[in-house]
Amino acid sequence: MKPFAAAFTASMMCCTSALADVPSLAVDANIVFLGEVHDNPNHHETQADWIAALQPAALVFEMIAPDVASGLSAADRADSETLGKALGWAGSGWPDFAMYAPLFSSAPNARIYGAAVPRSMARQILSDGLSVAMTLEDRQRFGLERDLPAAQQAAREAHQMAAHCDALPEDLMPGMVLIQRVRDAWLAQQALAALQDTGGPVVVITGNGHARRDWGAPAAIAQADTTVAVYALGQSEDGAAQSGAFDHVVDAPAAERPDPCAAFK
């Protein structure tokens, strides 16, 4: 087990010039989104470097439920093994916690917030509507009460179909897009709450799709509060164009992974 204090010290020793490598717009932002391809360790190394440089007052994670994050104690964050167990990471379905642990240790004093939409709630949204996820006030605040423009709805449905290897029925796509919009709104809600609670800056750890400025959580924040300065970093693989609008995109080698569509064949 590696104490987080030692990990933080090592991180700062290796990254004393890291702030110079972070764009000034990110340094000055209230909320910084750090996108990722979830299983790419290179992307998590970049995130850890940016977090070490920015030293945010709060970290918001797509992967953690709000109640789990709020229940973390200082003892839970004593080392990576203890933290992983406190988060219930092993049974969460997310990639190896070893890739995510440095994100916590790079800012050991940051408050942790969670924005994960429970799977049970996602299913309930499809059957019972958005009221199970947010109040009417918040749905209006983050734009969930408005239909998307037709072109954006079609693009989002195509994106979801491609992400699922063109293997799912088309009539499921509108519901999947709706769930993604709810996840964007939850990320935005938690990021704004973290900013209000701590004064910022706030760093949000999430997939590239939720970090994009044009229709991800940054767009939901812009709907809610135009005075909040947001910066969005996307991360690509092997030089491939990254879908969506970002303030900056960092490229890295692709992670070694099996064919994600093999299960559908």
List each model region and its residues:
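Short internal beta-strands
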Residues: L59-A65, Y231-Q235
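C-terminal regions of proteins
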Residues: W186, L192-L195, V203, H210-K265
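Zymogen propeptides
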Residues: V22-L54
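Solvent-exposed loop/turn segments at secondary-structure junctions
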Residues: V37-N40, I64-V68, P118-A122, N208-R212, ...
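A substrate-binding/cap region within the structured catalytic cores of diverse enzymes
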Residues: L72-A194
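Generic beta-sheet signal
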Residues: N30-V32, A57, G200-T206, V230
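Membrane-embedded segments
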Residues: N42, T46, P66-A75
